[in-house]
Amino acid sequence: MITRKQYPNHHVYETEIGGRAFTVETGKVAELADAECICRYGDTVVLTTVTCNPIPKAGIDYFPLTIEFEERMYSVGRIPGSFNRREGKPSERGILNSRIIDRPMRPLFDEELRNDTVVTCTVLANDYDNPVEIVASLGASIAIACSDVPWNGPVATTNVAHLNGKYIINPSSDERDAADCFVCISSTFEKLVMIETEAKEAPENIVYECIRVAHEANMEIVKFINSIVAEIGKPKFTFEKAAVNHELLDDLMAYGLGKIEYALDTPDKNVREERLTAARLDFQEKFGEKYEDFDTHIEVCLYKMQKKVVKKWLLQGKRVDGRGMDEIRPLDAEVGVLPRVHGSGLFSRGQTQVLSICTLNTLSAAQKIDTIYPEDTKRYIHHYNFPAYSTGEARAARSTSRREIGHGALAEKALLPVIPSVEEFPYAIRVVSEVLSSNGSTSQASICGSTLALMDAGVPIKRPVAGISCGLISDQETGEWRTFTDIQGVEDFHGEMDFKVAGTTEGITAIQMDLKNKGLTMEIIADALERCRKARLEILSEVMLKAIPAPRPEVSEYAPKMLSLKIPVDKIREVIGSGGKTIQKICADTGAKVDIDDDGSVFISAVDSAAAYAAKKMVDDICFVPEVGKLYYGKVVRILPIGAFVEIAPGHDGMVHISKLENHRVEKVEDVLNLGDMTWVKFMGFDEKGRANFSRKDALKEMANQ
């Protein structure tokens, strides 16, 4: 006898988000995971699981948290396009979604937790209209909050779009694309912990309001999650925090805090590192024999000493390099720094330096995307490379990191609103940003460098884009806080916020905010937005526009020459020809490449303009349709007893009947026209068989009356 499996811990919870039902189901699947839930929003469904190793990992000084965002092609009813028809490594957007989940959650874990923790979000169904990253983020928050892993959550995540004067919660893909401002916000009940923004030069007040609306929606979601935790949440396990030799720390503070202050008090990163190394050697000589565990604890002690100094100085309005709180490091911008490439820009901000290179190609070079999202091609691509030498490290090159993918996507998002349409500029565009030197804010430097490279390449961008970052330091006991402009490496490392804002003179195009504290108030957000606005305008006017005031009028001589035109859809077959013979002949005769879309868009590329225009003329000739009543100048290509055939365009001829040759009776066609003669004719229309009929007589009469 078979017994039916029971699910005694099965629970279903439901709330409403953005006017649509959001359902959470637990206790039915993945029973061996520490916690799990299936979240459904419309027809988007995500399974989230949490597993945690009960034994702490030895020999590390960080919390080993891993967020896995698993895309499944069956979720959209498709089979993967790979050779073995299996999902491979995560897509770029999948990696970005895992970062969206990771970034708001990580600061809320105890930094001294050492247990391997893995959160896996598997997309089971995706309807495109209900954002999968939101469902996964909420599922991760619910699963961790209900697990026994210590965490200071929950957090909620909401998308908001500003479209036609309205603020839409969790917009569909179409609404997101049409919106002038789109934000993804994660927050606890009290504070914001993550901001992602993409906008079409939106003013700061619109961005601020989007953030506020999202935070209000998140507050209600946090209440909902807390109600679930109250019913089924597990008690959190206790753990032994990483031991710190407080006696050693006290001795170091008393003896060496002044040495740390001296080491940090310089604008030069190399000098700072040399001084810190000297201080460490001095400490080892002084206390190495006294404390047997000196080597075990010295790095933690040095970190705490540096953090104390940086925090004290910043709260006092002092920075390690002597700048004011709103002062930007020395800037420099150059264009045309490389030969042969289509466009290049070198942007330097203090000891941060980025070289960006722009490459133009035919639209067939656009990136093909095989994912669970609606987008299937990408015409504008930005790649960001962060080699070890940029920070002075001796480390071999490795595969592209998630950080590099994230920074590349941020720069891509920042510049996309100013990239011309395919009709205005029918090129595929790739920009690569090479970080040559890193001392903070390389992602924002890559945005500035990429703008320079695009303009140098002759890409007619709407307006230049610049990026700047803003930092934060606060005192949790007093509530005091200070923001500061253009953070450098040591301020990023010991500070609490990296608030990156990119935009033009007209408004914001992208924001990314990362935190190391427990969250921000809306007051801090408003302050950071205004601080970044002022700095952005200064960078554009004082440096970038002086390097290159406007995009170059022509693309590089080494770039392919592109033309675009539109033909009737019913003419596509004629242009392609039987088995592709016609289009192949066009390419062979001119040396150009011709691509045709299903909507009749034709894109022609060639190494020089003459070849491109020759191919365009051949396409125009094939698609030529005469207008009734219009005069045409053509060549006699054939003579019959009943009339002459006149070709008015390559491949387009028609008959002039003998009765239509002259105003008087004509006995013989050759009395008026001979083979090869040029003559004016008037198009009279097509007969029932689709044959063109011309009249020379009517053409001459009309010309005589003009």
Identify the role of each PLM range:
Residues 2-240:
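Long, basic N-terminal domains or extensions that often function
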Residues 558-562, 569-706:
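Single-stranded RNA-binding regions, centering on S1/OB-family and related RNA-binding modules
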Residues 2-53, 61, 238-374, 560-574, ...:
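Extended amphipathic alpha-helical scaffolds
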